[in-house]
A protein has these predicted regions:
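Short glycine/serine/threonine-rich phosphate/pyrophosphate-binding segments
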Residues: 71-74, 95-99, 125-128, 150-155, ...
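ATP/NTP phosphate-donor binding region
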Residues: 32-142
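Carboxylate- and glycine-rich phosphate/diphosphate-binding segment that chelates Mg2+/Mn2+
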Residues: 201-310
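C-terminal charged capping/lid subdomain of soluble metabolic enzymes
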Residues: 32-43, 47, 353, 363-437
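C-terminal catalytic subdomain
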Residues: 310-374, 380
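Hydrophobic alpha-helical topogenic segments used for membrane insertion/localization
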Residues: 3-26
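Glycine/threonine-rich beta-strand-loop-alpha-helix active-site module
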Residues: 126-230
Length: 437
């Protein structure tokens, strides 16, 4: 009995001590939680980093067919992949303009096809299920995704659903949740920015939950990417701008990650950043500039290679959360969020951003901090010259908790971010996004 009484006293004393400590510092538990989060995130990054060489060897990037009129080679690409009837996945505009001559070329080469041309921006779970149903009803054996990131992501997700008929989209969200071979995918980008033609990612919106699912699995990497600049000349200026900044975000976020970088990913990111700084404004001002259009396609591809290896960061995590709630165009969200997050990262990313400032010619002298800040300022200037906003005034305070929850779950749970955020820091960034509108 005495031992029990003594134990109770000790327990009470311990509780009291914790209470006193908490009273002395109300952030006691928050600090402990933050430290645990940092440890878990960094440990997970290091574990994943060890598996990357094996993943790279098992799942090489897509083969590339590039240059003006390269889309004419799609039939021979499909024949090489033994695709006899292909599911063409696209959106309404591209379906009316770019797809018909490609479909006619397939007919001439004896390749059957069926077309789903209702993919929306931020493709939904409902759209993915419709594509899957049409694919199965028509006995298809491959996917041909033509358009921006939305058709490519929808095709990837549909391929995953065909391969795993009993697993809903939500259960495949996260890293390596598909883990099974899917039907061959050929990606034909008509925008220059998403990088989906080379990556293992697909982002799908659940409108009922107002949430975006990021599915990342190496089995979803397309077998071929067809980079034909002639297919991008009809892009409106706004789409040129936002998809171009999307590609820049991929390259920059890849470059500043805490882990996973290697010489190849860094080289791809650097090449992408330089090409974008040299060619995005040209493509924006003259959509028929084929040289600039092709350079932007290559930049998007290179950026995709980079972040397919390293992942991205909080810019994308916040953009995905906002897209789920407000249906914000992904590239536009990245354009607004990127400079704010890069500034918030502070000294953790100054060396990398300083080097990007040097190779782009933005600033070649001064301290790392000065060069990094000049690089961020150059991004803001580029946005301004293309008519993109500096912030968003439509974000409501009542949605902050949900955005914070989703962004932290994605950022801390998936990406090797250079700085690990807690709720307070994420809220600070969201406030800046609103205040700078």
């Amino acid at each position: 009995m005495k031992k029990t009484y003594k134990a109770l006293l000790c327990g009470a004393a311990a509780v009291a001590a914790v209470g006193i400590a908490y009273a002395m510092d109300e952030r006691f538990f928050e600090k402990a939680k933050d430290k645990l989060t940092v440890f878990k995130c960094r440990a997970n990054s290091k574990i994943m980093e060890q598996a990357l060489p094996l993943t790279d060897a098992m799942f090489p990037g897509p083969k590339v067919v590039s240059g003006a009129d390269s889309a004419k080679k799609i039939p021979e690409v499909l024949k090489e992949l033994n695709v006899n009837k292909v599911m063409i996945v696209t959106g309404p505009t591209v379906g009316r303009t770019i797809v018909p001559p490609i479909a006619e070329n397939l007919e001439r080469h004896g390749i059957g096809y069926t077309i789903y041309d209702q993919v929306e921006a931020n493709p939904s779970v409902k759209t993915v299920e419709a594509i899957r149903a049409q694919y199965l009803e028509n006995g298809c054996d491959g996917f041909l995704a033509i358009g921006g990131g939305s058709p490519m992501d929808a095709a990837k997700a549909a391929a995953a659903r065909v391969a795993k008929p009993n697993t809903p989209i939500g259960k495949m969200a996260g890293l390596k949740k598909v883990m099974i071979k899917v039907a061959p995918i050929v990606a034909v980008p008509t925008t220059s920015g998403t990088g989906s033609e080379v990556t293992m990612g697909a982002v799908i919106s659940d409108h009922d939950e107002r949430h975006k699912y990021a599915i990342m699995d190496p089995n979803l990497v397309p077998k071929y990417a067809v980079l034909d600049p002639k297919l991008t000349v009809s892009m409106p200026k706004f789409v040129t701008a936002t998809t171009g900044i999307d590609a820049l975000t991929h390259a920059v976020e890849s470059y500043v990650t805490w882990a996973y970088n290697n010489n190849a990913s860094n080289r791809n990111a650097e090449e992408a950043v330089v090409k974008i700084f040299r060619n995005l404004k040209r493509a924006y001002e003259d959509g028929n500039d084929l040289e600039a259009r092709e350079a932007m396609l290559i930049a998007s591809y290179k950026a995709g290679l980079a972040f397919n290896h390293t992942g991205v960061g909080y810019v994308h995590a916040i953009a995905h959360a906002m897209g789920g709630i407000y249906n914000t165009a992904h590239g536009l969200a990245n354009a607004v969020i990127m400079p704010i997050v890069l500034e918030d990262y502070g000294t953790a990313v100054h060396p990398q951003l300083a080097h990007l400032a040097e190779i782009t010619g933005v600033k070649t002298t001064g301290s790392d901090a000065e060069k990094a800040n000049a690089f961020i300022a150059a991004i803001r200037q580029m946005n301004r010259e293309m008519g993109l906003p500096t912030g968003f005034d439509f974000i409501e305070q009542k949605d902050f908790p949900q955005i914070i929850k989703w962004a932290l779950a994605e950022g801390n749970g998936t990406y090797p971010v250079p700085v690990i955020y807690n709720e307070a820091r994420m809220r600070h960034v969201l406030n800046r996004i609103v205040l700078e509108a």
